[in-house]
Amino acid sequence: MKTACLILPNFKIKSELKRCPNLSNRQILIYGFNRNKEVVVDYTNNINGISKGSLLKDVLLGIKDPVILKEDDRYYSYVQDQIIGDLFKLFGRLEINGYECVYIDTSYICRDASDRLEIANTILNLLSKDFNPLLGFSTGKYSSYVSALMSSPGDFNVLKFDKNRIGEFPTLVMPISDELKKHMHLLGLTNFERIANFKRENLLS
């Protein structure tokens, strides 16, 4: 397994809670701007029925007294730089994909399962458990990403990629927006096999 993927779900929320731990039991919405409209860019897990990219004004109709924060990319970059700096001290080959995803090339140090266990423990011990890190190992970037999504917070998962079983993968592991995943689920497209069997003209409509 030559690639590790580290996912930090709700990174912006976790960063804000690192700064203001007194908000830990509150419903929090972080908003930014898309085409001059205020949209939700992250939110706490105690808020249901919304997705990233939703208009803030629409979301507020269904939530009573949430904490509303404007996204602070300067601060999030600072928090991320600390994490990446610690990883760079141990692993020289990293690829950063936004705030929530880091790929780590382990091909030159991971020879067997015992090496992988040591690498996983090293990565997870670098991070605060409050970030609920997800860690996955596989042969390539996307399969390691899927592996991470299938792991448990604070733990790691190993995925032996088999192209003959790709149809079983849930659509939630696709690197697409939450809103699009929601629409696909409403159409019954819950795994890759169902997408493959869906008529192309219907899929594009």
Short names for language-model regions:
Residues 1-103, 108-110, 114-117, 122-124, ...:
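Residues that scaffold, gate, or flank divalent-cation-dependent active/transport sites
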Residues 66-69, 93-96, 133-134, 190-193, ...:
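Short, well-structured beta-strand/strand-turn elements
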Residues 62, 86, 122, 126, ...:
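Generic, well-ordered alpha-helical scaffold segments in large soluble proteins
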Residues 150-205:
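Compact, charge-rich alpha-helical regulatory domains located at protein termini
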Residues 39, 48, 144, 164-172:
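Flexible, active-site-adjacent loop/turn segments at secondary-structure boundaries
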Residues 37-38, 143-145, 202-203:
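Flexible loop/turn segments at secondary-structure boundaries
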Residues 114-155:
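Structured, non-catalytic alpha/beta "coupling" segments that mediate domain-domain communication
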